[in-house]
UniProtKB/Swiss-Prot annotation:
Molecular-function GO term, any one: structural constituent of ribosome
Species of origin: Thiobacillus denitrificans (strain ATCC 25259 / T1)
Cellular component aspect of the GO annotation: ribonucleoprotein complex; ribosome
PANTHER family: 40S RIBOSOMAL PROTEIN S14/30S RIBOSOMAL PROTEIN S11 (PTHR11759)
Family matches, as InterPro entries: Ribosomal_uS11, Ribosomal_uS11_bac-type, Ribosomal_uS11_CS, Ribosomal_uS11_sf
This protein's name: Small ribosomal subunit protein uS11
Sequence similarity: Belongs to the universal ribosomal protein uS11 family.
Gene giving rise to this polypeptide: rpsK
HAMAP family referenced in this protein's UniProt entry, alphabetically: Ribosomal_uS11
Pfam families attached to this UniProt entry: Ribosomal_S11 (PF00411)
Ribosomal protein in keyword set: yes
Length: 130
């Protein structure tokens, strides 16, 4: 039997980032919030499903707010103060995520809508039935 050697645990050095970009992907079923640095390297991310909401409760503005708070708290550990917000998708969490990030104390520099719009590409699916 081989003897066990103690594995060295290296503490990861957290980089200090002053400004970041909050990418909000708000679909009809879920909301994904990713906070990156200026180069696009992810610092933190959170989803409505990961915040404990399942099923139809994931697609609520409150679930998106909780996801934004979780991602924002992790990003504050990196020293992020200013955020540029990029929103993608038509979901119900579009506005509440921006409000939650603002309430956490981030200075929101710009808000832009980057929802991809086809130039008459693929045929869309049938109308959503309730």
């Amino acid at each position: 039997m081989a003897t066990k050697t103690a594995a060295r645990v290296r503490k990861k050095v957290k980089k200090n980032v002053a400004e970041g970009i909050a990418h909000i992907h708000a679909s009809f079923n879920n909301t994904i919030v990713t906070i990156t640095d200026r180069q696009g390297n992810a610092l933190s991310w959170a989803t409505a499903g990961g915040a404990g909401f399942k099923g139809s409760r994931k697609s609520t503005p409150f679930a998106a707010q909780v996801a934004a708070e979780n991602a924002g708290k992790m990003a504050q550990e990196y020293g992020v103060k200013n955020l540029e917000v990029r929103i993608k998708g038509p979901g119900p969490g579009r506005e509440s995520t921006v409000r939650a990030l603002n309430a956490l104390g981030f200075k929101i520099v710009a808000i832009s809508d980057v929802t991809p719009i086809p130039h008459n590409g693929c045929r869309p699916s049938k109308k959503r039935r309730i």
